[in-house]
């Protein structure tokens, strides 16, 4: 969700923050994870500030805290419309400072496992076309979700979720998809929720402000049910407006809207997925039950599902959850690596050979027959928007499952046979991953015969007593 970082910096303790998170999550949040994450939020924020995050401040010099949808108190700190970018830059600086090697243009093809224990991975160097293996004591899957299935873009293709799925790891809570309420109608431009904590108001069709009591997903669903809404930013002060200069520029250049004079039409779209690779409080991947972990495998970020968010996301918890899960998984992986030995050389060798064969087979089958990966993605987005949108039903989900299966069986044209910098091949691999995770999410939505959080079934309009 596009917003700052929630913490109880302005409260006596984190109890209400935790309660708000549980309430938004509709009884599907994991209590220990919620307590540890909300309880450590202030320290995470302080650490980022120490590393150089230039937080917006109030008149007393304290971090400015905005009250966003689903928050019982002002709780969200940030840097206006650039919080995510600033946090990413600061974390990259810390990687450089610590001489942590990073490699780009690497596509992970497979995780190598034996007896529920990670041995390494096989990857493709996109720049050179080389397929290589890395033996590892611990592996952290820190990745995005799979919301590209709805949006038709390549920002979140579910690659890590697909890697886990191929190894027989059951994914969790895939039926829950968060929609961003402040999306400009007929565009993909998502405005930060922080605007609502700085004087912005969502106006319904009746001309009255819409409720922000029940969280951003509830607000998004209300907007969709009403056929749209408008965002009024005319009451944002001049001092606050300086923190949203990018918003003003994007609205003017992309939509021709001056928010100081005109209201902004809204229509929510899928913004992030909540489910993914199930993890415990320490980021260890679990499979088949919360007491059964996969040795050496960890997950963090949007690819992970620690059940922090439950059935719906609350304001300010998205970035907080990513930071907290990254720290937990990284620390646990380091501990694992320090006490383990390398193993699985023969399994890695076999996996490497199989990857070479698959790669050569895909490149040798280039030709004009079939459709492009982009066409597949566009068709998938149409299917997901139609049948896996705000309201779902058994008949619609059955149609979605059949459509995705047909897309998986469709021949895809690959015109470039060169192994070097073959971005067309990479897009095909990612599209295959996205299809597999999208199929699993439709199955999960079909299996949950109730309405809970942001999963709404028109044929099961109420929720079960037991989640």
Regions found by a protein language model. Name each.
Residues 1, 6, 47, 53-67, ...:
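Glycine- and aromatic-enriched mobile tails/lids
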Residues 1-22, 26, 152, 181-182, ...:
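Conserved N-terminal glycine-rich FAD pyrophosphate-binding loop of Rossmann-like flavoproteins
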Residues 5-12, 32, 79-82, 127, ...:
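Alpha-helix capping and helix-loop boundary segments enriched in small/acidic/polar residues
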Residues 24-64:
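Rossmann-like flavin
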Residues 50-130, 135-138, 142, 180-187, ...:
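Conserved redox-cofactor binding core of oxidoreductases
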Residues 110-128, 132-133, 261-308:
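FAD-site-proximal beta/loop scaffold in flavoenzymes
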Residues 138-189, 307, 315-332:
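Glycine-rich loop(s) and the adjacent beta-strand/alpha-helix scaffold that form part
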Residues 163, 169-270, 332, 336-338:
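An anion/pyrophosphate-binding glycine-rich loop and adjacent beta-alpha core
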């Amino acid at each position: 969700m596009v917003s700052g970082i929630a913490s109880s910096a302005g409260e006596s303790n984190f109890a209400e923050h935790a309660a708000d998170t549980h309430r938004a999550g509709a009884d599907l949040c994991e209590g220990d994870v919620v307590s540890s994450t909300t309880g450590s939020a202030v320290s995470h924020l302080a650490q980022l500030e120490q590393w150089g995050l230039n937080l917006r401040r109030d008149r007393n010099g304290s971090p400015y805290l905005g009250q966003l949808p689903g928050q019982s108190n002002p709780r969200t700190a940030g840097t206006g419309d650039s919080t995510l970018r600033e946090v990413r830059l600061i974390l990259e600086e810390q990687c450089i400072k610590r001489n942590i090697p990073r490699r780009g243009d690497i596509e992970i093809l497979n995780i190598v496992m034996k007896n529920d224990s990670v041995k390494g991975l096989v990857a493709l160097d996109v720049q050179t076309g080389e397929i290589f293996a890395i033996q590892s004591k611990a592996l952290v899957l820190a990745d995005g979700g799979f919301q590209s299935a709805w949006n038709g873009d390549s920002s979140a293709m579910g690659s890590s979720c697909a890697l886990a799925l191929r190894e027989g790891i059951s994914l969790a809570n895939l039926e829950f998809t968060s929609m961003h309420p402040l999306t400009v109608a007929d565009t993909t431009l998502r405005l930060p929720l922080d605007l609502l904590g700085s004087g912005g108001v969502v106006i319904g069709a009746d001309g009255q402000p819409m409720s922000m009591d029940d969280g951003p997903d509830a607000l998004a669903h209300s907007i969709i049910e009403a056929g749209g809404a408008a965002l009024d930013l005319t009451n944002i002060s001049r001092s606050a407006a300086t923190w949203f200069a990018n918003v003003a520029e994007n609205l003017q250049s992309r939509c021709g809207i001056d928010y100081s004079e005109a209201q902004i039409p809204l229509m929510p779209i899928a913004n992030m997925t909540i489910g993914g690779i199930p993890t415990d409080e320490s980021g260890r991947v679990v499979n088949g039950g919360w007491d059964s972990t996969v040795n050496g495998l960890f997950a963090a970020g949007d690819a992970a599902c620690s059940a922090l968010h439950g059935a719906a996301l609350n304001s300010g918890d998205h970035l907080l959850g990513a930071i907290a899960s990254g720290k937990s998984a990284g620390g646990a992986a380091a501990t694992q690596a320090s006490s383990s030995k390398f193993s699985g050389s023969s399994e890695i060798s076999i996996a490497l050979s199989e990857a070479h064969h698959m790669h050569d087979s895909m490149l040798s089958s280039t030709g004009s027959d079939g459709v492009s990966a982009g066409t597949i993605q566009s068709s998938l987005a149409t299917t997901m928007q139609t049948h896996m949108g705000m309201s779902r039903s058994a008949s619609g989900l059955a149609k979605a499952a059949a459509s995705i299966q047909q897309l998986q069986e469709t021949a895809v044209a690959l015109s470039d046979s060169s192994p070097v910098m073959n971005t067309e091949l990479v897009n095909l691999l990612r599209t295959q991953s996205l299809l597999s995770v999208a199929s699993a999410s439709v199955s999960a939505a079909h299996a949950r015969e109730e309405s809970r959080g942001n999963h709404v079934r028109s044929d099961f309009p109420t929720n079960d007593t037991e989640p």
